[in-house]
Curated annotation (Swiss-Prot):
Function of the molecule: Component of the nuclear pore complex (NPC) that seems to be required for NPC assembly and maintenance. Involved in nephrogenesis.
A Gene Ontology cellular-component term: nuclear membrane
Any Pfam family: Nucleopor_Nup85
Subcellular compartments: Nucleus, Nuclear pore complex; Nucleus membrane
Biological classification of the source: Eukaryota, Metazoa, Chordata, Craniata, Vertebrata
Protein name, UniProt field: Nuclear pore complex protein Nup85
UniProt keyword annotations, A-Z: Membrane, mRNA transport, Nuclear pore complex, Nucleus, Protein transport, Translocation, Transport
Keyword Transit peptide: no
Keyword flag Nucleus: yes
Disruption phenotype: Morpholino knockdown of nup85 results in abnormal pronephric development characterized by underdeveloped to completely absent pronephros.
Quaternary structure and partners: Component of the nuclear pore complex (NPC).
The organism of origin for this protein: Xenopus tropicalis
């Protein structure tokens, strides 16, 4: 096993582990539950247990409202990228991948700006500190992502590479813009102490037009410096710059650049700017004097700005393969041994060395969540940069990081739905992970359960569908919602549970004399075949509907078939027989003699079954009401039998 690059971070938990007892724990998706057990450490004295349980979250970012927007919006970009990859397989997609990368960066920048606004509006110091920390992380993400976009996705060659790096520095180092704003707000800009810092700062970023505009203010306000300003302006104007259109070859550019540089050196040698130290400094920057450039580290603020400025004036046609040398030397020169590199410095150095695996590794160490590494790795995988890098347990790096990121989303009460799509696009282990996580989604509401159910049904996750339906059926049953419980048990195709709920419906009918949830029972359809008891419930309700519609003959036949089929619970037999009483008392004979004999047999079978299952002492205690009902039934059956025999005899004559 590889050794850890850094020691794991320690999280102190006040009050836990101070009573010399062993600590128990339970892992959750993104959470860790900690508690003190009954077991004491050896040699320790008996002490009271800590009465609290502690929930430790590994990723607090997921609960930030601003970062939730980042997760939501980047999800749609991710899904769009996967779909376009399927549609355009085999085609060159460089321009599209660059656009996708910019979309990700746009979302990052929007979140940063919103976080800035929150930081400025909040008055609570602790919350403000948290916002500043998150802004710092988001800024590092966008800075690193932008560099990876230039080096790995655009794969810019010598020449255009420097143009992109200049844009990168201008976007992320804005110190000079703040300086110039202060200068221009003053009454006399050219006399402002930071005026020449603004000119030099623009030059260091290759923004020659802006530098010339500031220089023009100096020329108009100082007659003595006007001629020098004109010479310096001419040098800035003449500085060769490669264009991204590629209309100029590198050889032509290098020739022009060499002539221009020689002209700058001549002016220095001739002492053109000797009377104005500020202009001389600018000219020394133009000829690539590294000592002078390094003296302006306060304007550049970062070593990577120094790197790009150094390349601009010394090696404008630097090749991608040479970047790592200049990057390392620029870092060493900028820090000058006064401080050690920060984690962000290591990430950028790894990028300049084109070691994308080290970039991912370094950012995984410093980041509090997997968003950056998961999405960047996925994007670079579409650039065919990870094909040869498989992890020891089978999954490639892209899938491993996406699985971890999606697992983290499942710990959130609403973001778990985003995690489903990430699992979908992990071909090796995604389906297995999704099955395990869907079983652990808390089904707090029926709406959430229906969402989870649709997800599982769409992906043919049969066991998870059954599990969700059973869970919701039990919740509904515990809450006394029999209709909902029956509906969920039918969806789960759980015959045993459907039988249990059907019995509850029948018990409720016996106690109240009517059914609840009639719409559900009336529309069971083929679902009633799930269990015998459910079939009985549906048919018994159909009998009541026929009776209410005065379809007495059909109702009588159905009632008799329900009794002879013996699918009703024993406790319900007397209720069925009593339901026959109104039909037996009709003026018109409903039950034939044969049907009446069947009813009599059912009554006697019921009595015999009751005698077999009841002790003699209990028989004596039987309620007289039941006895009265049975006597009424026997009398009604006898009368109906006599009427039926007479009627049938008359019909035969």
């Amino acid at each position: 096993m590889e050794e850890l690059d850094v020691d794991p971070a320690e999280t102190p938990i006040p009050g836990l582990g101070q009573q010399n007892r062993h600590i128990g724990f339970s892992w959750g998706p993104g959470d860790l539950l900690l508690y003190e057990t009954l077991y004491q450490k050896q040699g320790s004295e008996t002490a009271a247990r800590c009465p609290f349980m502690y929930l430790v979250r590994s990723d607090e970012d997921i609960y930030s409202p601003v970062l939730r927007k980042l997760f939501n919006e980047s999800h749609s970009i991710f899904v769009g990228l996967q779909k376009s990859a399927e549609e355009n397989a085999g085609k060159s997609r460089k321009a599209q991948l660059v656009q996708v990368s910019r979309n990700y960066r746009s979302v990052l920048r929007a979140c940063m700006e919103e976080m800035h606004a929150l930081s400025e509006s909040t008055r609570e110091p602790s919350q403000n500190t948290k916002y500043i920390s998150q802004i710092s992380i988001l800024s590092a993400m966008e800075l690193s992502w932008n560099l990876c976009e230039i080096l790995f996705i655009e794969s810019a060659p010598a020449g255009p590479l420097l143009i992109l790096l200049l844009d990168w520095v201008r976007l992320h180092v804005c110190e000079v813009d703040n300086i110039v704003q202060d200068v221009l707000r003053s009454e006399r800009p050219t006399e402002h102490e930071k005026f020449w810092d603004g000119v030099t700062g623009y030059v260091l970023q290759g923004r020659m037009n802006e530098a010339r505009q500031l220089l023009a203010k100096e020329a108009s306000s100082s007659v003595s410096a006007r001629s020098m300003c004109r010479v310096l302006d001419d040098l800035l104007k003449k500085m060769p710059m490669l264009n991204t259109a590629g209309t100029q070859t590198l050889t032509e550019f290098e020739l022009k650049w060499q002539h221009w540089r020689e002209e700058c050196e001549r002016h220095l040698q001739n002492g053109t700017f000797s009377s104005n130290p500020h202009m001389e400094v600018v000219c020394r920057v133009l000829v690539g004097d590294e000592e002078v450039i390094l003296e302006k580290r306060d304007l550049m603020t970062t070593w990577y700005h120094f790197l790009v400025s150094r390349l601009l004036f010394k090696h404008p046609t630097v090749k991608p393969t040479e970047l790592h040398f200049y990057a390392q030397s620029s870092l060493d020169m900028f820090l000058a041994g006064n401080s050690s590199p920060e984690p962000l410095d290591n990430i950028l150095l790894a990028a300049f060395e084109f070691d994308i695996h080290q970039v991912i590794k370094e950012f995984s160490i410093v980041s509090s969540n997997w968003w950056f590494v998961a999405h960047l790795t996925d994007l670079l995988d579409h650039c065919q940069l990870f094909q040869a890098h498989n992890l020891y347990f089978g999954a490639n790096m892209r899938e491993f990081l996406l699985l971890d990121y999606a697992s983290g989303l499942f710990s959130h009460h609403s973001l778990w739905q985003l995690g489903v799509d990430y699992f979908d696009y992990c071909p090796n282990l995604g389906h297995v992970y999704l099955e395990l996580h869907m079983e652990r989604v808390p089904l707090n509401t029926e709406k959430k359960a229906l969402k989870a159910l649709r997800i599982c049904e769409k992906r043919q996750m049969t066991e998870q569908v059954r599990s969700i339906c059973k869970t919701m059926a039990m919740q509904s049953l515990c809450n006394g919602r029999l209709g909902s419980a029956l509906s969920w048990s039918i969806r789960a195709k759980d015959a045993a549970f459907a039988t249990l709920i059907s019995d509850r419906f029948l018990k409720e009918y016996s106690e109240r004399g009517n059914f609840t949830d009639l719409d559900l029972i009336d529309n069971l359809g083929s679902a009633m075949l799930l269990s015998d008891r459910l079939t009985f419930l549906g048919k018994y309700r159909e009998f009541h509907r026929m009776y209410s519609q005065e379809q007495f003959s059909e109702a009588a036949s159905l009632l008799l078939s329900l009794m002879t089929a013996r699918i009703a619970p024993c406790s319900f037999w007397l209720t069925l027989l009593l339901d026959a009483l109104p039909l037996l008392e009709q003026k018109q004979v409903i039950f034939s003699a044969e049907q009446t004999y069947e009813l009599m047999r059912c009554l006697e079978d019921r009595m015999a079954a009751k005698l077999d299952s009841t002790s003699p002492d209990e028989i004596q205690k039987q309620d007289s009401v039941d006895s009265t009902k049975i006597e009424m039934l026997r009398l009604a059956l006898a009368r109906n039998l006599a009427r039926a025999i007479v009627t049938e005899g008359a019909l035969q004559e």
